[in-house]
């Protein structure tokens, strides 16, 4: 579903903003033509291995291998997140001087001013979201379980998910501050536009 949604979104963007998407692909040829497809395929393959290897590894008492597979899956997912944060922040804080953008290397465009702050923010945000998703799934399974043992297990799952979500969410405001501070240091007018101009109501709702 995610792949289909992403493909549809890309198709719409190519039609509606053809010049912009062409420029973005031309600015990050290695990332979009090699890096992103490779990471996406690897992550998908490891995800299927992770899901379908649980029963055989559990029966063979080799849960450690399943944990290692999960760690590899998370590393690939994190790499994909970090890689795509490059073009996202390039649109916000492109390297200066702006008239030399066409002569700047691809890595310099990725490692721009806001790249690492956004990485921090998204890492913490995704960790929080993951914890709460575990909590939601645990609550759903709890409500639909008939056996007492299952209800006790999913009650425990919900508590653990909630604990993870709250614990990881605590530093989220600090990560947001670091990200916005970097934008202000890059160009204060961008920060003013976000915080007190047309985007101010969006920030207030947040």
Where are these regions (language model features)?
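Polytopic transmembrane helical bundles with strong interfacial aromatic enrichment
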Residues: 1-206
């Amino acid at each position: 579903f995610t792949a289909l949604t992403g493909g549809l979104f890309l198709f719409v963007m190519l039609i509606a903003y053809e010049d912009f998407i062409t420029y973005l692909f031309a600015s990050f040829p290695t990332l979009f033509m090699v890096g992103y497809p490779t990471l996406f395929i690897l992550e998908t393959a490891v995800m299927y291995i992770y899901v379908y290897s649980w029963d055989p590894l559990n029966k063979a008492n080799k849960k450690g291998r399943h944990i290692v597979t999960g760690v590899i899956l998370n590393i690939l997912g994190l790499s994909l997140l970090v890689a795509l944060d490059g073009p996202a922040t390039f649109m916000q804080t492109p390297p200066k001087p702006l008239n030399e953008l066409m002569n700047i290397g691809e890595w310099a465009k990725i490692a721009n001013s806001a790249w690492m702050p956004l990485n921090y923010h998204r890492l913490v945000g995704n960790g929080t979201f993951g914890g709460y998703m575990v909590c939601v799934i645990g609550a759903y399974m709890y409500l639909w379980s008939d056996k007492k043992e299952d209800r006790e297990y999913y009650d425990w799952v919900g508590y653990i998910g909630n604990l993870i979500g709250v614990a990881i969410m605590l530093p989220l405001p600090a990560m947001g501050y670091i990200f916005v501070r970097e934008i202000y240091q890059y160009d204060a007018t961008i920060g003013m536009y976000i915080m007190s101009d047309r985007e101010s109501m969006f920030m207030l709702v947040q």
